[in-house]
Amino acid sequence: MKASGTLREYKVVGRCLPTPKCHTPPLYRMRIFAPNHVVAKSRFWYFVSQLKKMKKSSGEIVYCGQVFEKSPLRVKNFGIWLRYDSRSGTHNMYREYRDLTTAGAVTQCYRDMGARHRARAHSIQIMKVEEIAAGKCRRPAVKQFHDSKIKFPLPHRVLRRQHKPRFTTKRPNTFF
């Protein structure tokens, strides 16, 4: 899978094709993060074939739809449990991100894993994504923003104006 652009969250439901032995096969639902619905269906078959004796040729997709965020204007903390294949083996990992949407946090995770661990998108498997309360956060990178009186430093900038003289009688004001 190529994690191109912002990933979207899809709910994919599939099952085995009905046979004379099993008229109503069980449905399997997955939460897939992918750039589009075609990749989401492909990832569904990849994961389901690892878990159950199911293949695309002997199964069908019952439903594939995009899941939209309930509150996309509120900043939330997300905990992501994942496994990834590195050059030395398979590792489990727990990461925390702060974002507006679940899909945004997962996209951030894919970018971060590529930057920090050189892990490509195809070697990362997202196991669980959960919104977590501020008190349950463990990572200092996320916890630093949980201050109600948070302040950000104003940069001390020297603006060189194009059409003003270099030498003048008054000192410049560089505090904005």
UniProtKB/Swiss-Prot annotation:
Its main location: cytoplasm. The modification N6-succinyllysine is found at K76. The modification Phosphotyrosine is found at Y63. It is found in: Cytoplasm. Coiled coil: none annotated. There is a cross-link at K11, K128, K170 (Glycyl lysine isopeptide (Lys-Gly) (interchain with G-Cter in SUMO2)). Signal peptide: none annotated. One of its GO terms (biological process) is response to antineoplastic agent. Keywords: Cytoplasm, Isopeptide bond, Phosphoprotein, Ribonucleoprotein, Ribosomal protein, Ubl conjugation. GO terms for molecular function: structural constituent of ribosome. GO terms for cellular component: cytoplasm; cytosolic large ribosomal subunit; cytosolic ribosome; postsynaptic density; ribosome; synapse. InterPro entries: Ribosomal_eL20, Ribosomal_eL20_dom, Ribosomal_eL20_eukaryotes. The modification Phosphoserine is found at S71, S123. Pfam families: Ribosomal_L18A. Belongs to the eukaryotic ribosomal protein eL20 family. Component of the large ribosomal subunit. Binds IPO9 with high affinity. PANTHER family: 60S RIBOSOMAL PROTEIN L18A (PTHR10052). Component of the large ribosomal subunit. The ribosome is a large ribonucleoprotein complex responsible for the synthesis of proteins in the cell. This is Large ribosomal subunit protein eL20. It comes from Rattus norvegicus (Rat). The lineage of its organism: Eukaryota, Metazoa, Chordata, Craniata, Vertebrata. The gene is Rpl18a.
